[in-house]
Amino acid sequence: MPRRGAEGPLALLLAAAWLAQPLRGGYPGLNMFAVQTAQPDPCYDEHGLPRRCIPDFVNSAFGKEVKVSSTCGKPPSRYCVVTEKGEEQVRSCHLCNASDPKRAHPPSFLTDLNNPHNLTCWQSDSYVQYPHNVTLTLSLGKKFEVTYVSLQFCSPRPESMAIYKSMDYGKTWVPFQFYSTQCRKMYNKPSRAAITKQNEQEAICTDSHTDVRPLSGGLIAFSTLDGRPTAHDFDNSPVLQDWVTATDIKVTFSRLHTFGDENEDDSELARDSYFYAVSDLQVGGRCKCNGHASRCVRDRDDNLVCDCKHNTAGPECDRCKPFHYDRPWQRATAREANECVACNCNLHARRCRFNMELYKLSGRKSGGVCLNCRHNTAGRHCHYCKEGFYRDLSKPISHRKACKECDCHPVGAAGQTCNQTTGQCPCKDGVTGITCNRCAKGYQQSRSPIAPCIKIPAAPPPTAASSTEEPADCDSYCKASKGKLKINMKKYCKKDYAVQIHILKAEKNADWWKFTVNIISVYKQGSNRLRRGDQTLWVHAKDIACKCPKVKPMKKYLLLGSTEDSPDQSGIIADKSSLVIQWRDTWARRLRKFQQREKKGKCRKA
């Protein structure tokens, strides 16, 4: 039988949706006529630039299971259909039997192919009257943006009815719309309340579409955006975007229309005439994809999900896919696709995160921060070399070998961090080279790890033979060493200190020779607490002239001496009583033994 009761543009919308139903129902034979050519992706324009795209408008209820709280036929029961002939009402009674397909009225008839010439109707048990109710619950399978909910009746329309929606797959329910001739009594709502910007996300109650007539074929159609003040600017109305979103729809029939004869003597016949019967339940809308997909598909688990584009992800394309966090996720609009943008990590990172503060500081252009930069890079964009590496300017920053190791010399360099651009290591005094691996001009290598390069003396220091004539009384003044001298525990114990020195340079200072020496090892400490490193050695000019001690530049010696005050109150003094012997490497072990014996108090016995 033809539909009646739809009004205005909504009727055209419902008609178009009804005509589209067979195509949605799955007739594979129709596909043989389809042109087998690749269709352009609606989510991108002809230049490949992203643009808003939305799935097709569908009747999302078609073919889906509806859970109902009451269905006639279990056990078989009588029902009577009321028709009007003039002013007379005529009842014709029938049997509802769930086990007989010809007499059954199952819930599947709510969402099957609706053929006006062969109506199939779901039907409830007779006379389920207020305060009892009958509910129809439909799961859409995922979030949809619902445009309308419509029901076409085989019975008179309910006197009171409510439509609810769920956004969390039936865990909680929110009112969508109320219909009643007594809104205040049934739902504690005023009838036909004005919709304003302040309450446009609230359900209202209306007494329209609640007449008892027509007795069959009546339509109730609820438009989710009709009369909502900001519907014209839906893209910029998060309130309405949330309002139309649903995963489930529930219809509650609260109160039957009656003719007032249900309490008369033959009330049993009358009560068998009052029931709810619906030939078609439609939920028109689009798969919710936030403007980032043009269709919904089945995933591996057979769940309905958006086929996301614009680098988005999620069942509703409601987040950016991994590594595309350079700006925050946004819903696409007619003006801006708001695609997610990949982080700029110069091919050195696989993960990143979004930082709102950086995004704001950049003028809302970039907020991505790269995580775990590889290939020896560092920084928010993996755009410079980490400590200990420098840029190889012959390669782009995106190259996996864009950063080279500094390779600073472990002795010549003052640290392992080099210049990020040139690779120049920080060199110690007198050291040069990009890795600090050689002595600078005017310097020569030493064996000291502290000062590996020392300045070359301008001229060799004068010796006793060249600078000062040997005094005539040297034989009576001191006894110069001749041949090889030996060291023993007794000699070691008699002296205040014992050190290995390297003579670096010498200069005359009045009656003294001032030697710059490098103390390589300390085998015995005096009161002045000698330490390794550069030190000043003072020797009286007469002692040098008499060759006691006899020293030469750039030679190493073992010096055993006594603690005396030096001319400038710094350094150490060697005199004719000091023991200065050219160094032999074999002495190191013997001197360590002397040192251990001294610690045990052996020097006091010697």
UniProtKB/Swiss-Prot annotation:
Superkingdom assignment: Eukaryota
Residue ranges of every copy of the Laminin EGF-like domain listed in the record: 287-342, 343-405, 406-455
Entry's localization field: Secreted; Cytoplasm
InterPro entries with a match to the protein in the record: Galactose-bd-like_sf (IPR008979), Laminin/Netrin_ECM (IPR050440), Laminin_N (IPR008211), LE_dom (IPR002049), LMN_ATRN_NET-like_EGF (IPR056863), Netrin_domain (IPR001134), Netrin_module_non-TIMP (IPR018933), TIMP-like_OB-fold (IPR008993)
Record motif Cell attachment site, residues: 532-534
Glycosylated sites: N97, N118, N133, N419
GO CC annotation terms, alphabetical: actin cytoskeleton; basement membrane; cell periphery; cytosol; extracellular region; glutamatergic synapse; nucleoplasm
Presence of the UniProt keyword Glycoprotein in the record: yes
CDD domains, per the entry: EGF_Lam, NTR_netrin-1_like
Disulfide topology: C121-C154, C287-C296, C289-C306, C308-C317, C320-C340, C343-C352, C345-C370, C373-C382, C385-C403, C406-C418, C408-C425, C427-C436, C439-C453, C474-C546, C493-C603
Segments forming domain Laminin N-terminal: 49-286
Residues of the NTR domain: 474-603
PROSITE patterns (alphabetical): EGF_1, EGF_LAM_1, EGF_LAM_2, LAMININ_NTER, NTR
Pfam families attached to this UniProt entry: EGF_laminin, EGF_LMN_ATRN, Laminin_N, NTR
Keywords assigned: Cytoplasm, Disulfide bond, Glycoprotein, Laminin EGF-like domain, Repeat, Secreted, Signal
Residues spanning the signal sequence: 1-25
One annotated GO biological process: positive regulation of axon extension
Function description: Netrins control guidance of CNS commissural axons and peripheral motor axons. Promotes neurite outgrowth from commissural axons but acts as a chemorepellent for trochlear motor axons. These effects are mediated by distinct receptors.
UniProt name for this protein: Netrin-1
Species: Gallus gallus (Chicken)
